[in-house]
Amino acid sequence: MAEVNEPLQIELRKIRNSSTAGVINEFDVIVSAVEGTLKEQKTEATPTAYLVALLTLVKEFTDLKKNFKGHTFQLLELVIKYVPSNVLQAKFPQILSVLAPVVNNAETNKTVLLPYLNVLEKLLLLQDYSSWTHGNSCKTSIYILLFFALSNTEKTRVRSLQILANILKNPPAGPVTEHPAIKYTAFEPLRLLESLATAKKPKTPAEVQKLNNSLVLIRVLCSSTHWPMTLVERLCRSCVLIVGQRSTNSILLVYQILDGLSKKSVDYTDAVSLRMTLICLQKLEPSEHDPILMVGWLKAMNTAIRAFNILDKETAKYECLHRFKAFFTLLESESMEIRLQTATTICSVIGCLDTTPNSFAVVEEICSFICDALRDIRFRLAYPECFQIISSLCDKLGPHSDPYLIPALEVIDYLRGSEGFDGKALVDEAIGSFVRAIGPEAMLRVLPLNLELNDKDAVGRAWLLPVLRDNIRFANLAHFTNYFVPLSGQLYQKVIEMNDLDSIPSKLLQTLVDQIWSLLPGYCYLPLDLQSSFTLEFASILVNVLYEQVSLRSVICNSLTALVETNSKVADKLPLDDVISVPVSASDASSNLAFLTNMSSNFLSVLLNVFSSTPSQYRYPILKCIQTWIFISSNDTIHSVYKKVTDLLPDSLNDLAGSFNIAADGISSPMAYSLIDLLIVISPYLNQDYAVTLFEYVHEFLRHVNPAIQKKGYKLLGTLLRVDYGKAYATQHVKEIFEELSSVADRVVSSTRKDRLASLNALYELQSSELVIAIPQLLPEAIISLKEVNEKARHTAFQLLFNIAKSAVNSVEFGNSKPERVEKFVSVISAGLAGSSTHMISATIIAISSIVMEYKVFISEPFLVQLISTLNLFITSSKREIAKAAIDFIKISVSSFPVECIKPLLPELIPNLLAWSHEGKANLRVKVRHLFEKMGRKYGIAEIEPFFPAEDKKLITNIRKTQERNIRKRAMKRDPAKPSSAQPRKTFASAYEAAVYDTDDEAEEEFENDEMNNGNGGDLRMDEAFVQEDNDEEPLDLLDIEAVSKISSTDPRKKLAARKQKLNSAFKSNEEGRLLINDSDEDELIEDSLANAQQHAEVNRTYLEAVAGKESFRRGLNNRVKFSNKRVRDDYDEEMEEVEVPEVTRKPAKQKFDRKQRGQKGY
């Protein structure tokens, strides 16, 4: 008899091996009965056969025991996922004939209904268009879902709504885009709504609940698909009647329904329905004194206006803009929610504007409203919203904001200059919108800076410079050259004329000069007049600034970089950052690049000189600028730069020979360092004619005595191996390159390790067959590098190991088939297990784990069993580093490989693992416990418990009870009616790290469930209450008279957390920062006493330090209090730590205080 398919087999095994009492037995009984029936009938155990057998059980639903009913449908939900779609589609009427009668059974509860509804969803999603339009099966199923969607049972009601929404959002392929079921799906709820809306007598609570349920159902339908046009008028009429009944919840649901109608009208271009919706909304405007209803109405109006602007722009402009005044008066409200939503709605109204004269008349009226509001005390609270509206107007009108919005700009400037005005940040954002819209030149005509100080009565606006800096783009570069360059010169001249350069006026003027030049990157962001404004005169000014003002070099270089990058992106038709449209065409940008190319030679010469004279910590902007300009330079220019660098390089290397001096901060590094950095930047833009020379330089650099030169040599090699001509040369000379790298292996130091690994990785990415024979020679270095402290070096080592494995797996040198090659490669790695050092052995185990995870589908079961048995021996190692790596490998094996591979080895694995469960240091003890928990979930507690000796039975008993308790908690917390909000899983650098360091499945599931439940808020108007329970296992008895004392309006968990933090200070901690808690009550009392004593001692020490310590006060003449201003060196010394720096020409930097490292030592 054929077996069921593997995924279904795994799922069935999981539920049958579940360790929870009650659940496991019933699932096992049902599955065993089904399989026994299939064997008796000599039927193949396919998913379809399971489905038929389970449907037979469903026919006998009334005869089943209560617990078996829910489990039968859960199994049915599981099995139906693996049944072929064509079978479910063809046999849907027969399946439904079995499922439909279950609805009428009085004993049906949520344990049955939830999987029942899931089965129904699966069946309906598979039906084609003809099934929906012909026959009654689909219609019957929809009526079943509508029945539960209107029920009072929350979980089944919400799940039914989710299923209906999912079905309507996924219509079958057919002649129309909307779902064919929407007609009868919408008709029944609407008919019920009309009957409830027209009822004149007061409604009972049950009728109110039914009304709200029907409104929620219609809201789901409207937001999922297009409401039938023939029913829109009837729905709007019912909405008007319901709003007249003045039920807050019902009115909010009405607004949400109309909001959904507006959204879907856009998707289906139904302007008629949208017009009826907007008319209905205008009739249903609530009182401005009701914030809840007003916010809901404004949201619906906002959606309707935006939809109208998409479908019918002309009508929207005239029908929506006349409501601006009515909307604007709502900004007087004291409710912040109303003001915020009003501003959003007004911005949508502004979106209906265009650049025609009629719109400009409306803009002038809107601007007048805003100016009057900013002067009116009634709108004092609405200033932020007014600024938001002004910004929206500027973004919509663009350059046309001048002159129509200039009055608003003047009012804003007046407000910012007022004393006591506290909204300057918001004003700056609004003014920034004006800068982006009309440009800096027009802005400064309205609001001049007045920095010349020619007119004593003029108001200075130095605060405007940072606003300009952050918002200038697509401007005229001529404005900077004609206005700001002379202004900067005047201010700088005043600085020079001052005698004291350290005086406050001098520093203020220098700050203004720096702020003026900080505007240049904005002016260089795709300027409109580049070719006419970027003259030789302006270029000479930039060169002088680069040479003379060191503090402005980064600004100038960033400007030159932006000039090239923005034009390059536009020329290549790539989007600019956060910019939808640009005012420069691709052809104009290409012309600009050609213009800049003619100037690149001169600029590169200057930049090379400046680069060599700049301290290393300030070089990055210059180096990036050089790289950017080389990109657009001609081949002759690139060759000229290359020749300059290489001509100076030999002498500079000779000057550096035998020198290990490290340049201090603020001092330029040796010339050789600068030249090699430039060579690395230039090399990607050269061609194959330079390949031989460049690789000769690599040879020379790698053999240099200076480690910094070696590091740069590896960087140059890595760069060459990633460009086309370098790859071509390396492919032909791969053997020589590898021999060169092998010959300098003994010269490698920690600072060059990462770059060497990157070069080797780039070499193996070529996948040359000549490198296969070198694998045994390179593997030890790659393996030991897996234990590098530097994270980037460690990740590069993993990449190198995988590339080596890829070469081996693709080579016939390791076997004839892929499984054989993988196993042989793992065997080659296993040679490292015989290493003499702890590091090498643990690194080898990590390497084996990584390769096994990467190629697990090719590894045979016998080889895997042998591998696990071998590494099992290392679990008992006395070296924690080795044991940890071996335990991680076992964890990977348990997680990734079939049960049959691991189960036979449990008698050997578990005793060895238990040896570490008694470890005093908690790291391995917790790791082993988590591994046992994972085994218990996968194999079942009953399978692993026999291998626990008597003295360790307590551990497995605790694990079993913990799992059962977690299952009960999740069962109580799980709410299928609420949508899942699972957190995104953390990503890792490799499959090995994902398997070893990822969160435990069960713990993650608990976390996600807790997050889901904690995130679901109740009624926003209801005060929050907290219940404090003494025992987690026994829920609070609310009928008890003492229950009142357990309910609080404040969260008791905060006090409990503070109390725990206080108690935790009494416990000892191990080297990993974990608390060590003794089981003895006496020890706890001793620890508490010690904690109290330490607390009192700390108070006393602090007091004595305050009155008699180094920083205490003294009394001087006339009994005045004096404090010492001397800095005590001992108080400020920080621990030095080695850090990897890009270049050894810098001093080792002082490391900042590292709390994570030093926190383990009691700091």
From Swiss-Prot:
Region annotation (Disordered) ranges: 1127-1163
Protein name: Putative ribosomal RNA-processing protein 12
Compositional bias ranges of the Basic and acidic residues kind: 1143-1157
GO molecular function, a single term: RNA binding
Location relative to the cell: Nucleus; Cytoplasm, Cytoskeleton, Microtubule organizing center, Spindle pole body
Species this protein is from: Schizosaccharomyces pombe (strain 972 / ATCC 24843)
Keyword Metal-binding: no
GO BP terms, alphabetized: maturation of SSU-rRNA
Main location per the UniProt record: nucleus
Family label: Belongs to the RRP12 family.
Domain of life: Eukaryota
Keyword Manganese belongs to the record: no
GO CC field: cytoplasm; nucleolus; nucleus; spindle pole body
Skewed-composition ranges (Acidic residues): 1131-1141
Keywords in alphabetical order: Cytoplasm, Cytoskeleton, Nucleus, Ribosome biogenesis
Role according to the record: Required for nuclear export of the ribosomal subunits. Required for maturation of the RNA components of pre-ribosomes.
